[in-house]
């Protein structure tokens, strides 16, 4: 491992999910397939939303943004991992590692904010259906997404800046398939108090704040559904939330799993394996969760395919 001025490291080693050479071809093709499915699945959601004017509503606008962010999230980590596995090369440059941290933190934060915004959208749709169009105006929708971007950029910029202040004095091997913020901070040989404090405080404020907002929205939604007299009305109201609730549960449960796993051990492949759920699996499943349970998305896709076949 090369060093510069004995303090600034030039590169890190990403140990990946397994050091077993026999498993590398399987890992490569598995993740290559998952990457393609994720990108194409989310692109189809975006395409269906853009081409069908009936989907030009607040809910699908947020879903379109979520699909775009999921493509960016998985593209931040998986292409580099695939390149390393293919070339049998574990190194990532210092600059590349910082860039991964910045963009990964940015897009995970955006996922977090967008899920909260979508919960608010469902709250307005079910609790205030007659005022939905007057509340969820295009201006408000754009503002909510813009605020989400600004908050995420500020968060990732601060986290990356604090990492830049750290020194790495020895060979740094990261037991992960990408540069994960908390792992990198704990591998530093300089004082990590500010970085640790920023990670914990911002996770509590941003992540916890969004989760509280989601839980509050759904508490109101449940109360409103219970007030509906007919069973059919209750089912119809609840069915509009099932897809979003499934994605929220998957996202936050896997994040909790990563937190609990890292609390037990820092330098372990188990944490990397657990983080696969929200870094790869969740973005891959989101399009299927929304499209399989959403008649509007399925209709838009059928119409798109039909038009293509008729040409």
UniProtKB/Swiss-Prot annotation:
The keyword Glycoprotein applies. Residues 1-25, 79-97, 155-196, 266-271 are extracellular. It is a multi-pass membrane protein. The keyword Phosphoprotein does not apply. Keywords: Cell membrane, Disulfide bond, G-protein coupled receptor, Glycoprotein, Membrane, Olfaction, Receptor, Sensory transduction, Transducer, Transmembrane, Transmembrane helix. This is Olfactory receptor 1073. It comes from the Eukaryota. Residues 47-57, 119-133, 218-244, 293-311 are cytoplasmic. GO terms for molecular function: G protein-coupled receptor activity; olfactory receptor activity. Disulfide bonds join 97-179. Belongs to the G-protein coupled receptor 1 family. CDD domains: 7tmA_OR7-like. It holds the Pfam family 7tm_4. One of its GO terms (biological process) is signal transduction. One of its GO terms (cellular component) is plasma membrane.
